[in-house]
Amino acid sequence: VGDIIAPLIGANPGEVSMHQNVSLLQAMLISCFQFTGQRNKVVYSDMEFPSVTYVYDQFARERGARIHFIQSEDGVTVPLERMLAAIDDQTLLVPISHVLFRSSYIQTAKAIIEKAHAVGATVILDAYHSVGTMPVDVKDLNVDILVGGVLKWLCGGPGGAFLYVRPDLREKLTPVITGWMAHPRPFEFEVGKMEYRTDAFRFLN
């Protein structure tokens, strides 16, 4: 199924894995990062989908994250200049929506990604409301991580969330939230120390 999704986001076959929902995806992604150093800041706005903000407020903060919360001034947009100013050399993660669920406002994702990369931060782009409504190209955006789902504009059912991780970043991320399908030999049912696949399926659980 991931290979069916891949061309919709400009990804190659084998680069997209399927998951239960975006909230669990975000929790799994958070588990890949350490928030104990000076680079522990997470930047997002009050226009994000509540379920995602709950995951960051509870799970990421519990792991040591410092949340920088940007408030919309009009309930429609997130000021780009404030977002860019908030992303600094202490920023670890920038989890943002491509299209805001409340207002359909399209964020300038490429500029945010470029600023994040300039200071060494990682962007998790939620494309739930953009895939199926507008062109999305992970290569052109040079996005680190993209999540989304088929429930809305791809006219699918529940349980169809998807994940893209930039190939050069993939093996640098080791999720603590994991499972047997992320093992390189899942059907050998080996008990003991976890080993991770090197492909997109290393993020399965």
Whereabouts are the PLM-identified features?
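Pyridoxal 5′-phosphate
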Residues: V1-N205
